[in-house]
UniProtKB/Swiss-Prot annotation:
InterPro entries: Casein_kappa. Residues 102-122 are annotated as: Disordered. Mammary gland specific. Secreted in milk. Glycans are attached at residues 84, 86, 89, 95, 102, 118. Keywords: Glycoprotein, Milk protein, Phosphoprotein, Secreted. This is Kappa-casein. It is found in: Secreted. Kappa-casein stabilizes micelle formation, preventing casein precipitation in milk.
């Protein structure tokens, strides 16, 4: 394992050797045919191009971030929400017109009856 120190890397990388191919398997420069359209004024020379996916003989692997740290157990800091019963007071007004059994016309205002009801809403 080789240590790679580079001024552009924020922390050092360790290089692990990968699968190494024999020289016969490594692709060399290959000659590509001229693919320029016929509209070109000048004849283009044959171009040399490298294989688009060169094989790397090693992989750069970043070091583990928690190498020197001890294991810290994870603690759930989010408290579970418990439902709290909050009593609410609602005022219900019943307006009832009471009629007597007599034949007289009652011109008084209807009676107002106020009941206070307490309900629990969850």
């Amino acid at each position: 394992v080789a240590l790679i120190n580079n001024q552009f890397l924020p922390y050092p990388y360790y290089a692990k050797p990968g699968a190494v191919r024999s020289p016969a398997q490594i692709l060399q420069w290959q000659v590509l045919p001229n693919t320029v359209s016929a509209r070109s004024c000048q004849a283009q020379p044959t171009t040399m191009a490298r294989h688009p996916h060169p094989h790397l003989s090693f992989m750069a692997i970043p070091p583990k971030k928690n190498q020197d740290k001890t294991d810290i157990p994870s603690i759930n800091t989010i408290a579970t929400a418990e439902s709290t019963i909050t009593p609410t007071t609602e005022v219900i007004v019943n307006t009832v017109a009471t009629q007597e059994a007599s034949s007289e016309v009652i011109e008084s205002a209807p009676e107002a009856k106020t009941d206070q009801v307490t309900s629990t809403v969850v």
